[in-house]
């Protein structure tokens, strides 16, 4: 299953907002440098979906706000 994620780094709090069945907004506190925000998004999404991080994979958008994740 693929999901679309719009990431908001440098946020005051971490949260996941569901926009549609396969579209989410994720706010994280980390800065978008050296993959820190991407790693934090993985943690937040795994907590939201209640699955291990190993079941999530960033497919597209490594250096962009709009990303596509695969849930295995």
PLM feature spans:
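A generic beta-sheet turn/junction motif
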Residues: 9-11, 62
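C-terminal structural segments of small proteins and small subunits
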Residues: 34, 40-72
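Active-site-proximal or metal-binding-adjacent scaffold patches in catalytic folds
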Residues: 4, 12
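Compact, glycine-rich, soluble single-domain proteins
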Residues: 6-8, 22-49
């Amino acid at each position: 299953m693929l999901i679309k994620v719009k990431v908001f780094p440098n946020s005051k709090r971490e949260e996941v907002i569901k926009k549609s069945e396969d579209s989410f907004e994720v706010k994280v506190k980390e800065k978008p440098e050296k993959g820190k925000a991407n790693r934090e998004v993985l943690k937040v999404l795994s907590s939201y979906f209640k699955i291990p991080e190993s079941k999530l994979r960033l497919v597209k958008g490594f250096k962009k706000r709009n990303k596509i994740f695969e849930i295995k």
